[in-house]
Regions:
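Short, non-helical or kinked segments that cap or interrupt transmembrane helices
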Residues: 15, 24-46, 60, 88-93, ...
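Transmembrane helix-bundle core of multi-pass membrane transporters
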Residues: 85-86, 91-162, 189, 255, ...
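Membrane-embedded helix boundary and interhelical linker motif in transport proteins
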Residues: 8, 30-77, 81, 86, ...
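Hydrophobic alpha-helical transmembrane segments of polytopic membrane proteins
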Residues: 19, 71, 226-249, 271-277, ...
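Alpha-helical transmembrane segments within multi-pass membrane transporters and channels
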Residues: 24, 57-101, 108, 244-249, ...
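Membrane-interfacial amphipathic/re-entrant helices at transmembrane-helix boundaries
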Residues: 1-20, 48, 60-63, 89-94, ...
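Helix-loop-helix "hairpin" substructures at the membrane interface of multi-pass membrane proteins
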Residues: 13, 135-215, 239-245
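Inter-helical junctions in multi-pass inner-membrane proteins, predominant
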Residues: 1-16, 159-164, 190-230, 254-265
Length: 293
């Protein structure tokens, strides 16, 4: 049963990566930008939830909703202040700005909450289930995380395909200039994309901290990077690709820790990225883009 247990844990961890990767893939697919500060929004979401529960005594569900709202606002503010002026700038300028925003959020959290790691109280009180006569136990956090990932991916897919806002996102992703000529509010659409991505980061942050109950100003850094790897793995810009890439990456990481070495697990994850880029640079669901001259 140990292999099945590792597999389930890998799917759970991969579900968190998938939710984070959705933020990367949406922003890149629509705004054609890589928001490398996305991982730190995870940390902000965790701290908002932590503070709401410990200092304000809020119910866990209310604290999670507050966290999602706070990160939604944060995402829009970051887009307006940091990224909107750089839409016509070089990718290097956007990258440098993203790193600057990341350091700003980390140091702001360091100033407010200090460097000590906080013990995060899980927002999920469900104990989980036992299978195979008690030989296989699946925690409540694992079940909720996997279910949340499925619901988010399905909901986001339906939102994009069946709502006017979603159709506007598709139009902007295809041709921003043509979308603007058709009367679509490009600025509002891009801001909405950042808002949704940041709200998802908040949810991912809460799930991550519930599974691994610790929180500090750098909590989101490595999960953010791994989620970017997952987005590239699945094909950045593709929602199904983000989900598949995240889950595969989570399984690879957990199995590497279990059967190879916990110290080498991160190296193996990044080695997978290198192999994918060599074999299929566009990722599993990525499409080749032909430049017309």
């Amino acid at each position: 049963m140990s292999f099945i247990s590792y597999l389930i844990n890998g799917i759970s961890l991969g579900s968190v990566y998938a939710i984070i990767a959705l933020g990367y893939t949406m922003v890149y697919g629509i705004a054609k930008m890589l928001n490398f500060a996305h991982g730190d929004v995870i940390m902000v979401g965790g701290f908002v939830t932590f503070t709401a529960m410990t200092s304000a005594g809020m119910h866990p569900l209310a604290a999670v909703l507050l966290s999602a709202v706070a990160c939604t606002v944060l995402g829009v503010v970051i887009e307006r202040i940091a990224y909107k002026p750089l839409r016509s700038a070089s990718p290097l300028a956007v990258l440098i700005t993203a790193i600057g925003v990341s350091y700003f959020l980390q140091n702001l959290a360091l100033l407010i909450f200090g460097a000590d790691t906080k013990t995060f109280q899980s927002v999920i009180s469900f104990d989980g289930i036992s299978l195979a006569g008690g030989q296989l136990k699946i925690s409540g956090v694992t079940l909720v995380t996997i279910a949340a990932c499925i619901i988010i991916v399905v909901g986001l897919t339906l939102f994009i395909r069946r709502t006017k806002a979603g159709q506007a996102m598709l139009a902007v992703s295809e041709d921003r200039g043509a979308a603007q000529l058709m009367g679509i509010n490009v600025n509002g659409t891009i801001a909405l994309t950042f808002a949704i991505g940041s709200a998802l980061a908040a949810i991912a942050g809460v799930l991550l901290c519930s599974a691994y109950p610790s929180l500090n100003p750098y909590t989101g850094s490595m999960p953010g990077i791994k989620a970017f790897v997952a987005a590239v793995f699945g094909g950045i810009g593709s929602i199904p690709g983000a989900m598949l890439g995240g889950i595969l990456l989570g399984i690879i990481e957990i199995l590497a820790k279990a059967y190879i070495s916990s110290q080498l697990a991160d190296a193996i994850v990044f080695a997978v990225l290198i192999v994918v880029l060599l074999v299929k640079p566009t990722g599993i669901f990525g499409k080749k883009i032909q430049e017309k001259v």
